[in-house]
Regions:
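GH16 jelly-roll
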Residues: 3-180
Length: 180
């Protein structure tokens, strides 16, 4: 659906869902007010609590040399319905340059890397609930403009259009998963 609008946002995603493995994405992302580029993983469905994995997330209020990685829990957990918790980490990297962003999805552990260096690691016991072994995830590459979060930084209409430049996306299946 295309609406009569001054701006559009977009996303592409994998058709297939993945449970375990290693993703590498070589990309450079825009850094201007009002943009919200993200490389993230959305849950297929599954338990009452589902997870979200943000490999890269940025909004224009952040400095160009900072980005966030994050793990979210959504749904019913901790005795509450419609609950949401997040476990973010700020990472020093200039996303306006090409970098290789890596997510290793392992049993009981998520490892985030930039250019081969571990920048964040979350293990099953580190957070309140662990849905990441219970369902599959698809990769989403998204670029939004405005909205409640990114728009709170102001908008830079004169810097449009913007885009995410992707050199490649690679997926490596774990050897132990090949026998399933």
């Amino acid at each position: 659906c295309i609406r009569d609008s001054l701006y559009t946002s977009g996303r592409i995603f994998t058709k297939q869902y993945f449970r375990y493995g290693k993703f590498e994405i070589k990309a450079k992302l825009p850094v201007t007010a009002g943009v919200w580029p993200a490389l993230w993983f959305k849950a297929n469905s599954g338990p009452a609590c589902v997870g979200e994995i943000d490999l890269v997330e940025y909004i224009g209020c952040m400095k160009a040399e900072k980005m966030n990685v994050n793990v979210h829990l959504w749904g019913t957990f901790g005795g509450k319905k419609n609950n949401h918790k997040q476990y973010p980490r700020s990472v020093a990297v200039n996303i306006s340059n090409y970098h290789i962003y890596t997510l290793e999805m392992l049993r009981g552990k998520l490892v985030f890397k930039v250019d081969g260096k571990v920048v964040y690691e979350v293990k099953k016991g580190d957070i309140e609930y662990w849905p990441f072994d219970e369902t599959s995830y698809r990769l989403m590459i998204a670029l939004s403009y405005g909205g409640t979060w990114a728009g709170s930084c102001g908008l830079a209409d004169n810097s449009l259009p913007q885009s995410i430049k992707v050199d490649y996306v690679k997926y490596y299946r774990l050897k132990e998963e090949c026998n399933d």
